[in-house]
């Protein structure tokens, strides 16, 4: 049975993750976001779909701030580790989580982290979820 997302912020974060992950392989951001948003929705080719602004903000924001996000994440990794050493899923989730923590003041940092952890549990494993929690928590602690 197909899971039709309800456009909650949690669902849109997951769609943003799917979009950003797909963009690692190439393509246009808007095309990838459209696909991630609509692939499991019962729509026909003639239906015009407006992508939610939260989804677009996450995707475009991460893409625009990628070098800064990567630099900030690299600073928090243990010695001997780099972003290139991480699996693509974890790298994408760290970028998405950090972007929301630093750019969406209306979202408490801990909420953003918990949401990313739930996505990590679905698309990665418990070890990755703990790792992502550990890295992103450093940004929330630093801001407090």
Curated annotation (Swiss-Prot):
Belongs to the NusB family. The keyword RNA-binding applies. Keywords: RNA-binding, Transcription, Transcription antitermination, Transcription regulation. InterPro entries: NusB-like_sf, NusB_fam, NusB_RsmB_TIM44. The lineage of its organism: Bacteria, Bacillati, Bacillota, Bacilli, Lactobacillales. NCBIfam families: nusB (TIGR01951), PRK00202.1-1 (NF001223). This is Transcription antitermination protein NusB. GO terms for biological process: DNA-templated transcription termination; transcription antitermination. The gene is nusB. Involved in transcription antitermination. Required for transcription of ribosomal RNA (rRNA) genes. Binds specifically to the boxA antiterminator sequence of the ribosomal RNA (rrn) operons. It comes from the Bacteria. It comes from Streptococcus thermophilus (strain ATCC BAA-250 / LMG 18311). The keyword Signal does not apply. GO terms for cellular component: cytosol. GO terms for molecular function: RNA binding.
């Amino acid at each position: 049975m197909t899971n039709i997302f309800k456009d909650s912020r949690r669902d849109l974060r997951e769609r943003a993750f799917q979009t950003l992950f797909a963009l690692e392989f190439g393509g246009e951001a808007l095309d990838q976001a459209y696909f991630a948003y609509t692939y499991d929705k019962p729509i026909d080719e003639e239906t015009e779909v407006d992508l939610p602004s939260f989804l677009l903000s996450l995707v475009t924001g991460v893409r625009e701030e990628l070098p800064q996000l990567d630099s900030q994440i690299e600073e928090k990794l243990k010695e001997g580790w780099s972003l290139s050493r991480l699996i693509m899923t974890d790298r994408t989730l760290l970028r998405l989580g950090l972007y929301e923590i630093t750019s969406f003041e209306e979202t408490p940092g801990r909420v953003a982290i918990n949401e990313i952890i739930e996505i990590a549990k679905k698309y990665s494993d418990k070890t990755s979820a703990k790792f992502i929690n550990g890295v992103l928590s450093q940004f929330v602690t630093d801001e407090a």
